[in-house]
């Protein structure tokens, strides 16, 4: 009996030993394909979507392997992940693994330092070489790059903003930044720091010297969508709606001579102090009259929005200005009355201007107005504006001599007589903004205006002929007017205005 028990015990141990050896000697993993897997055998997905690329597989034991793939993730041409394997009842193997990548993606426009990218893979592989592979990639590395044109969808205050450039960068997953180029009013470049990348997108907020910026966004199909909500710093309370000044008439004392029916106030503010008392009083009154009759026909109000936009209620109807009114001013007949103006103002048809065509920002105690020239041209010309984009860019970024030549070619006129100083002034206004003064009165009126010296380049007669009758004809104002008249850009019925305009440069040096 004891002998039988001994045999039974030996048999059990032998079976157990055989079973253990059988498990240890399972070499089925060695039958798995090695190296590159044929494309027709790969079911490949990236973040849940089918994709293409090259897959390499190499099992190193029954429980482990390496999975490599090329040209799958933008900027990461070659990724290898160590995975754990588990054999299935049907002989196939399941595998999964995760790899943290601390290398920036290599793209055409960015190829440096180290953002964080997390890559996770899982799938199955059969001895016949059939592979199903799912890759998940998350982190700042997916966003790094330069976005513009068709790769950027940018909104500013819920309105599309085109023609801009955004650079997404990072040194690691906790230090992500976005560079905005000429997007925030008054700032050539703005860096958004502390960008939080999570849940398939990014978000954050940044304070600059001029504004507070909140933003959200995401990237899909190589296109970056960025939404900006901007609030301008406004310590002087300039952000509000302004209506036009009242048109009032009265008697002015022009160097001892009363001038009845003169415009005292209007929608155009003009205050010009020169030695000649006649011109010091007469010319501002003329400008107030012309502006006071024309502006109310096209403009109802202007709003400086909290986000830096400038919007307006305007009319696109025709403008009426009778030549006889100008003659009346010249020969002392007085200005048209309030009743005449009221009949000129449209009673309906007022429109709200589009957003992102003009901006304001405070700087050095001045209110700067900056035009978005590409957007204005696009709004005016629609799809035809695209063909002008290179020319507009060359003008905005060119020097005075180049710009003069380009504009002359476009308008088919000779601009060579106009000074470089005038074009430098205009380019500075377009590229950097127009520096305006703001003055509030105790009666609640606001005057927004330019200093007289701002017009020096275009008003000063640089030739100063010895013949006093020709004073002013050497100014760029007179030359520009004559060029545009000769080219019929200015209509003939406005020709008489030069009689008024010439008085400005004639008296400017004083």
Question: Language model features by range: what are they?
Answer:
Residues 2-6, 10, 14-42, 122, ...:
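Bacterial Sec-dependent N-terminal signal peptides
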Residues 31-40, 62-68, 89-100, 143-149, ...:
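Short, hydrophobic/aromatic-rich segments at coil-to-beta transitions
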Residues 34, 39, 52, 64, ...:
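Surface-exposed or flexible loop/turn and strand-edge residues in extracellular/cell-surface modules
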Residues 51-82, 152-193, 257-368, 374-379:
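N-terminal glycine/threonine-rich, aromatic-flanked beta-hairpin/loop signature
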Residues 58-66, 89-90, 120-131, 169-177, ...:
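Short, solvent-exposed coil/turn segments at beta-strand boundaries
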Residues 66-127, 167, 179-218:
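Post-signal peptide N-terminal segment of secreted/secretory-pathway proteins
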Residues 81-88, 123, 190-200, 217, ...:
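Short, surface-exposed loop motifs enriched in S/T, G, D/E and P with embedded aromatic residues
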Residues 253-294, 298, 318-349, 368-437, ...:
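Mixed-charge, low-complexity intrinsically disordered segments
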């Amino acid at each position: 009996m004891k002998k039988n028990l001994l045999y039974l015990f030996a048999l059990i141990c032998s079976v157990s030993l055989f079973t253990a050896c059988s498990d240890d000697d399972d070499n089925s993993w060695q039958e798995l394909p090695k190296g590159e897997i044929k494309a027709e055998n790969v079911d490949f997905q990236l973040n849940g979507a089918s994709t293409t690329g090259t897959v390499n597989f190499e099992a190193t034991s029954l429980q482990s392997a390496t999975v490599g793939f090329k040209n799958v993730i933008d900027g990461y041409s070659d990724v290898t992940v160590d995975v754990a394997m588990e054999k299935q009842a049907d002989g196939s193997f399941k595998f999964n693994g995760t790899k943290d990548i601390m290398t920036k993606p290599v793209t055409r426009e960015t190829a440096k330092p180290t953002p964080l990218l997390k890559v996770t893979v899982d799938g199955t592989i059969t001895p016949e070489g059939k592979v199903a592979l799912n890759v998940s990639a998350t982190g700042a590395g997916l966003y790094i790059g330069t976005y513009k044109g068709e790769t950027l969808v940018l909104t500013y205050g819920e309105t599309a903003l085109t023609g801009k450039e955004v650079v997404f960068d990072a040194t690691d997953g906790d230090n992500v930044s976005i560079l905005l180029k000429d997007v925030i009013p008054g700032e050539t470049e703005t860096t958004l720091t502390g960008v939080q990348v999570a849940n398939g997108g990014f978000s954050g907020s940044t304070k600059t010297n001029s504004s507070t910026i909140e933003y959200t966004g995401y990237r899909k199909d190589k296109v970056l969508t960025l939404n900006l909500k901007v609030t301008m710093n406004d310590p002087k309370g300039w952000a509000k709606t302004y209506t036009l000044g009242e048109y009032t008439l009265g008697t002015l004392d022009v160097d001892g001579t009363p001038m009845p029916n003169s415009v005292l106030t209007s929608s155009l503010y003009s205050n010009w102090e020169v030695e000649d008392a006649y011109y010091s009083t007469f010319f501002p009154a003329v400008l107030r009259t012309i502006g006071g009759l024309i502006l109310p026909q096209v403009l109802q109000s202007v709003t400086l929005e909290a986000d830096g936009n400038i919007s307006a209620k305007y009319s696109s109807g025709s403008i009426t200005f009778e030549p006889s009114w100008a003659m009346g001013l010249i020969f002392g007949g007085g200005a048209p009355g309030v009743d005449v103006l009221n009949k000129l103002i449209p009673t309906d048809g007022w429109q709200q201007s589009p957003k992102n065509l003009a901006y304001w920002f405070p700087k050095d105690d001045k209110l700067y107005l900056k035009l978005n020239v590409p957007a204005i041209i696009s709004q005016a010309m629609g799809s035809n504006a695209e063909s002008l984009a290179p020319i507009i860019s060359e003008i905005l970024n060119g020097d005075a001599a180049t710009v003069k030549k380009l504009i002359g070619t476009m308008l088919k006129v000779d601009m060579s007589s106009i000074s470089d100083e005038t074009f430098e002034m205009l380019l500075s206004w377009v590229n950097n903004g127009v520096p305006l003064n703001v003055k509030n009165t105790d009666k609640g009126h606001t005057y927004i205006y330019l200093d007289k010296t701002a017009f020096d380049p275009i008003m000063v007669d640089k030739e100063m002929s010895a013949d006093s009758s020709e004073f002013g004809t050497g100014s760029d104002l007179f030359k520009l007017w004559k060029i545009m008249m000769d080219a019929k850009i200015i209509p003939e019925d406005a020709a008489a205005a030069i009689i008024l305009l010439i008085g400005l440069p004639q008296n400017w040096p004083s």
